[in-house]
From Swiss-Prot:
Topology within the bilayer: Multi-pass membrane protein
Transmembrane segments: 386-406, 418-438, 456-476, 493-513, 542-562, 579-599, 608-628
Organism field: Dictyostelium discoideum
Protein name: Metabotropic glutamate receptor-like protein B
GO cellular component terms, semicolon-separated: plasma membrane
Chain ranges on the Cytoplasmic side, renumbered to this chain: 407-417, 477-492, 563-578, 629-755
Length: 755
């Protein structure tokens, strides 16, 4: 009795002591290969962390580190940070971090830090605080291979894995498929990483192109299965997450699931209770508590196949049954089979060779897959659109040139100087050709040609427009009626001078700028496996380009000034101020769009599109403004309209009265005595504009002037009476009209003293 009481007291003392002894805190840190949002391998580990924290009501919040496979520096920094923040249960969930995990476990083996490290065998060093997590998915892969073999319509299945060091999973998948279909063909490739979605997807596409309709994988995300689903076949859930919840039962045939919650709770409890099992080893299995199980089938899977697969799963729950290790094909890899016809588990895990197949089935290994670097050109729609639009505009320019040449003697064309109209249209054609070249893929030739064509095209276009209207301004801005002889041949050197300045700047740009085509990656939303060509130059080339822009800007400003000055011209055929001003303003507006694009970082495709569209739109609108009204008047009023050049002022009526006088009609315009105006007698002479070719010689010109003088003498018998206030104004307008008409067409200048 006394002994019984003593035992009870000891038990009570023990439990009371345990209650008062403060338990250890457990702070979990999980190191992941990728992002926990992958709804796959990393998601399952992170979910187990969260659940364990909730179940155990841990006071210290746990930690997680993601994407550690991206760089060794990031991985090492994560280990250091976890230790610095007081984590005492560190879970290394990535095989890629196993070596570094063992390194830090060795460094801190005397510290109160415990480790769960994913690997297949105990480390060589004695590290009692390290629990090995042998994530053995061989049975799961064998089962999925069996399912794929039964479901395959092509008789070809495949496998994508990080590398040859993980060949065991692929061999298990192949042997499962061969168990289901003896003549199966197996194709495989490696990605070089557990987590590289781009490479995994492209590798899967490559296997699918070789006939595979079901693919297994050892990847931490679903990129491989996305490629399978995109090809129209059923994917397999191989990340540990019930992927039918993401892609739907119609797309996922079967998934295996991993649930690590029990593992986290188990080892965290050991840390809290200070009951850590030295050098522990945890291996996954299909048995209850083994962390592996299968999700439900897709409704597209026939019941007969479901029954066969379920049967196989039940057999595989026997840990002594290892069909993935027991096959004569291992002999071809240099292994010896034991009495049961199997290789050892260690040999199976460390094997880095793909099985070679037998007389019934074959295997094809494509080795490590690398994504070929892909050239990304400008979009075909953009190139086609700009090319077609520019070609149509070139056709319109050619038609306009033909019209100008055919109807060059028509008053409306002749008054605008056909030679300069021709130059303007040629400049526009160069601009449109430059736009076509600008939209093509850059190379050394196109990088130079597109700038040359656009710049020279605009120089000829604007230069001709500027010079021909500068002549109009000089002739009409002449209140003292000074004799000014400005023929086309006197204007051509000015156009040539402007063009020479442009060519000089372009030569400097090309000679010193090192203009070239370069291949670039990482621009325009390109992936690291894509590149495009862009035009490039050095600093001297950039300076020359800025000078070129300033040069064109000055031309625009001068053109704006001249278009403003010729607004006062009251003869419609010579007054092109409105279309010129509109053209210049539109070009200037677009220039304020193009310049910022050229000096600021923008999408290359956007730059090209904007520049080409602005060039086409401004040039086309300018053509319509400058030539549309002329052609319309020729169609509606005839080619020889406005024999005396219509004017909105008194000069026009005076010209008409003089013309009537010449044909025998008398002008009764006498000044009235009521106005007290002095009558002035004026000798009438012909003031009609006479047009002739610029190529006529001086003899013909002299003869024409003599004939005009004879007509003036013959008509001098009658006087024209005009009010004094009208005489000076009318004389100015008439003389300017006559002078401009003659000079536009190469005739000899007539002095105002002849009137």
């Amino acid at each position: 009795m006394k002994n019984l009481i003593s035992i009870i007291l000891l038990i009570l003392i023990f439990f009371n002591y345990s209650k008062f002894v403060k338990s250890k805190n457990c702070k979990i840190a999980v190191l992941l290969s990728g992002d926990f949002s992958d709804l796959g391998y990393n998601y399952q580990f992170n979910e187990a962390r969260v659940k364990a924290e909730s179940i155990l009501k841990l006071s210290d919040f746990s930690l997680y580190y993601k994407n550690l496979d991206e760089s060794e520096e990031l991985s090492e920094a994560s280990f250091k940070d976890a230790i610095a923040q007081g984590a005492n249960l560190i879970v290394v969930a990535s095989s890629g971090q196993t070596e570094m995990g063992l390194k830090y476990a060795k460094l801190y083996k005397d510290s109160d830090i415990y480790w769960i490290i994913k690997t297949s065998a105990r480390p060589v060093d004695y590290l009692p605080k390290v629990a090995v997590l042998d994530f053995n998915t061989d049975r799961a892969h064998f089962t999925l291979g069996y399912f794929a073999g039964k479901m395959s319509k092509t008789g070809v299945v495949g496998f994508v894995s990080p590398g040859a060091y993980i060949a065991s999973n692929g061999n298990a998948f192949y042997l499962g498929a061969k168990e289901a279909r003896s003549n199966i063909t197996f194709v495989t490739t490696f990605t070089g990483s557990w987590f590289n979605p781009e490479v995994a997807y492209k590798a899967a596409e490559m296997l699918i192109s070789n006939g595979a309709d079901f693919l297994g994988m050892s990847q931490d995300d679903m990129s491989v299965q996305k490629a399978v689903i995109d090809s129209g076949s059923l994917g397999l859930g191989v990340t540990g997450y019930p992927t039918r919840l993401i892609y739907g039962s119609a797309n996922i045939g079967l998934s295996y699931i991993t649930d690590w919650t029990d593992v986290f709770v188990k080892y965290a409890s050991h840390v809290i209770n200070d009951t850590w099992p030295d050098s522990d080893y945890y291996k996954t299995s299909l048995n209850p508590g083994g962390s592996l199980l299968f999700d439900e089938y897709s409704y597209l899977v026939p019941q007969s196949i479901r029954d066969l697969v379920n049967n196989e799963i039940e057999i595989l729950k026997n840990d002594d049954f290892n069909p993935f290790r027991c096959n004569p094909m291992y002999i071809d890899l240099g292994y010896k089979l034991d009495v049961n016809g199997c290789i050892s588990y260690n040999e199976f895990e460390k094997n880095q060779q793909v099985l070679k197949g037998d007389k019934y089935s074959k295997t094809i290994s494509f080795g490590t897959y690398t994504i070929p670097i892909e050239f990304v050109d400008y979009s075909s729609s953009m190139k086609l659109g700009i090319t077609i639009t520019s070609s149509i505009c070139i056709f319109l320019c050619i038609i306009s040139i033909i019209i100008v040449l055919v109807f060059r003697t028509a008053r409306i064309i002749k008054s605008a100087s056909p030679a300069f109209l021709f130059l303007i249209l040629m400049g526009c054609i160069l601009i449109f050709i430059g736009c076509i070249i600008f939209s093509q893929s850059p190379n050394e030739g196109t990088c130079r040609a597109r700038v040359w064509l656009l710049s020279i095209g605009y120089t000829i276009f604007l230069g001709s427009l500027l010079v021909k209207n500068w002549r109009i301004w000089l002739l009409f801005d002449n209140p003292k009626l000074k004799k000014r002889s400005i023929t086309n041949w006197k204007l051509y050197p000015w156009v040539a001078g402007i063009l020479a300045a442009d060519v000089l700047i372009l030569a400097f740009w090309q000679g010193l700028g090192n203009i070239r085509s370069e291949s670039r990656i990482g621009i325009d939303s390109l992936t690291k496996y894509q590149y495009t060509n862009v035009c490039s130059s050095n600093d001297q080339g950039s300076i020359a380009l800025y000078i070129l822009l300033v040069f064109h800007g000055i031309k625009l400003l001068v053109a704006c000034f001249i278009s403003f000055k010729i607004k006062v011209v009251d003869i419609d055929e010579f007054n092109e101020s409105k279309p010129i001003a509109s053209s210049v303003y539109i070009i200037t507006f677009c220039l304020f769009i193009v310049i910022p694009l050229m000096v600021s970082p923008q999408s290359v495709t956007s730059q090209v599109t904007t520049i080409c569209v602005c060039a086409i739109v401004t040039t086309l609108i300018s053509i319509i403004l400058l030539f549309g009204s002329k052609f319309y008047k020729m169609i509606t009023q005839g080619a020889a309209l406005n024999q005396t050049f219509a004017s909105s002022s008194k000069s026009s009526s005076f010209s008409q009265s003089l013309e009537k006088k010449k044909t025998g009609e008398e002008d009764d315009s006498e000044s009235s005595e009521e106005n007290g105006k002095k009558a002035i007698v004026v000798t009438q002479q012909s003031v009609l504009a006479h047009f002739s070719s610029d190529t006529e010689d001086d003899e013909n010109e002299t003869q024409q002037i003599d004939e005009e003088k004879d007509e003036q003498i013959a008509g001098s018998n009658e006087d024209i009476i005009q009010p004094e206030e009208n005489i000076e104004e009318n004389n100015v307008s008439v003389i300017q009209s006559k002078r401009l008409s003659n000079q536009l067409n190469g005739e000899v200048e007539i002095d105002s003293n002849n009137l």
